[in-house]
Amino acid sequence: METHISCLFPELLAMIFGYLDVRDKGRAAQVCTAWRDAAYHKSVWRGVEAKLHLRRANPSLFPSLQARGIRRVQILSLRRSLSYVIQGMANIESLNLSGCYNLTDNGLGHAFVQEIGSLRALNLSLCKQITDSSLGRIAQYLKGLEVLELGGCSNITNTGLLLIAWGLQRLKSLNLRSCRHLSDVGIGHLAGMTRSAAEGCLGLEQLTLQDCQKLTDLSLKHISRGLTGLRLLNLSFCGGISDAGLLHLSHMGSLRSLNLRSCDNISDTGIMHLAMGSLRLSGLDVSFCDKVGDQSLAYIAQGLDGLKSLSLCSCHISDDGINRMVRQMHGLRTLNIGQCVRITDKGLELIAEHLSQLTGIDLYGCTRITKRGLERITQLPCLKVLNLGLWQMTDSEKVR
């Protein structure tokens, strides 16, 4: 019986080629006509993102991508008009323009001149020339958009958020990292809480507001009232929010992940508000909140015991706080306590005794632990990731 690979049905070849990386898919297509035909089957390229340098005209580029069924594109460098891409990819689903610093409102405006119903994800991160004008175009012609990345687009203002709230009703994920001009008014637009005609993006599930320095507790009030389906909220480096703002968030039943890293005004009181509410968080990050101490760990054990991931790096916690927390946190998978310089071997022994499900722990910069405590941690049955970083001990204590 003939068993040579050339006897395989094209469908089987396509299944095999589907497991190859992008470069090897292309190489397989060059072997023979049978492999070429199989390699061009759309199932082989399902989910693949084409990464393109648009430098010169290539008439065969987009027909080739469409023949493979590729609908996700990342532009690595943009020296041609963006409209060249839009016209060539009629059914495009995802367009990543992150880091295309030369993209302007004018260039985007010429590309988006009619509705593009297929586009679901648009990444404009670090496209620093983009302003509210572009958001007006996006809101008008990309009404099916579900993911919008605007991190580092520092010229966007509250007016831009009003346009988003008006036109992008299907939006599920929005990244506004380091959009420095945004204030509580803009968040109110998104949440449908202002007197504007915009309904708001009430279907949002993920919202990143990292390093939006003008936001205050009023933004959290808007979010808690209008964005009730939110699952992930990133407020890291938002220095204007305080414990009082967390009281607003404490009854958001859909919220699963909350990032408060480097929010300088958050203290044990804020953690108490979160723990006393009706949250069902699986992930909490309060790293570098230096007003968070051992009392917060007691609150977490009392009201946030469903956490799978907890980050407390550089917080003012000690072995006593660890002792108050670990007995109730049996489901914890990831614990980050790097640069918590008051933690000693005693704390590690408590962790090893009670947190048997841990798969990862960060001990970077925990300078008071020794070989003894480390040996206890390495005996955790599920441990896969151990970050020591600045962990220090004498030569005689080093693990061999």
Swiss-Prot record:
Assigned GO CC terms: cytoplasm; SCF ubiquitin ligase complex
Record-level GO BP terms: SCF-dependent proteasomal ubiquitin-dependent protein catabolic process; ubiquitin-dependent protein catabolic process
Domain of life, source organism: Eukaryota
Keyword Cytoplasm: yes
Organism: Bos taurus
Assembly and oligomerization: Part of a SCF (SKP1-cullin-F-box) ubiquitin-protein ligase complex. Interacts with SKP1 and CUL1. Interacts with SNAI1; the interaction requires the phosphorylation of the two serine residues in the substrate destruction motif D-S-G-X(2,3,4)-S.
Repeat positions for LRR: 144-163, 170-191, 203-225, 229-250, 254-275
Keyword match Cytoplasm: yes
Name of the protein this chain belongs to: F-box/LRR-repeat protein 14
Gene field: FBXL14
Annotated region (Required for down-regulation of SNAI1), positions in chain: 2-48
Keyword list, A-Z: Cytoplasm, Leucine-rich repeat, Repeat, Ubl conjugation pathway
Subcellular location per the Swiss-Prot or TrEMBL entry: Cytoplasm
Record-linked InterPro entries: F-box-like_dom_sf, F-box_dom, FBXL14_F-box, Leu-rich_rpt, Leu-rich_rpt_Cys-con_subtyp, LRR_dom_sf
GO molecular function: ubiquitin-protein transferase activity
Annotated ranges, domain F-box: 2-48
Physiological role: Substrate-recognition component of some SCF (SKP1-CUL1-F-box protein)-type E3 ubiquitin-protein ligase complexes. The SCF(FBXL14) complex acts by mediating ubiquitination and subsequent degradation of SNAI1.
Pfam family, one: F-box-like
CDD domains: F-box_FBXL14
